[in-house]
A protein has these predicted regions:
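Short, flexible coil/linker elements and helix-boundary hinge sites characteristic
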Residues: 37, 111-112
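Short, charged low-complexity linear motifs
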Residues: 8, 79-80, 118
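Short beta-strand/loop segment at the start of cytosolic alpha/beta domains
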Residues: 1-13, 17, 24, 131
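Amphipathic alpha-helical interaction surfaces in cytosolic regulatory modules
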Residues: 17-94
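Receiver (REC) domain switch/output surface
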Residues: 106-110
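Short acidic-hydrophobic, aromatic-tinged amphipathic segments that line or gate anion-handling sites
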Residues: 95-103
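CheY-like receiver
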Residues: 113-132
């Protein structure tokens, strides 16, 4: 069985999110989420304060990815920012990692304790032939 790994895109969240920086960020990100099942890691290392604008930006990214059956994970999130995400009630929507590398690697872990992905019909036929 051949399993192709889709690319993981890492995008750096700006230090301060304003209406203008949010529009630019989402415009830049659009080319990466317009794929089937986009896999995004948002690098939060520059985020000093997890305010409402930043949380809104994260949620917009998640919404765009989920429209295409993708996922967004957060990397390099500071402890105070994690606390703010929990307080705002959105921490359960994201997998949060201490580093960008850990967040990226989490996409590469096979099955990660969940049900394996469905096999393509051709692969299912091959599996059935091997059993018979």
């Amino acid at each position: 069985m051949i399993i192709k790994m889709r690319a993981v895109t890492v995008h750096e969240v700006p230090e301060k999110v304003t209406a203008a920086t949010e529009r630019k960020f989402l415009r830049d990100l659009q080319q990466y989420v317009e794929t089937e099942r986009p896999r995004l890691v948002l690098d939060c290392s520059k985020v000093r304060q997890m305010d409402n604008n930043t949380i809104h930006l994260l949620l917009c990214c998640l919404e765009e990815a989920m429209k295409r059956n993708g996922d967004v994970k957060l990397g390099a999130v500071r402890p105070d920012a994690k606390a703010t995400l929990q307080f705002a009630g959105v921490s359960r929507l994201f997998e949060v990692y201490n580093t960008v590398a850990e967040a990226t690697q989490s996409f590469r872990q096979r099955f990660g304790g969940i049900a394996p992905p469905l096999l393509e019909p051709v692969e299912q036929e091959r599996e059935a032939e091997n059993v018979a």
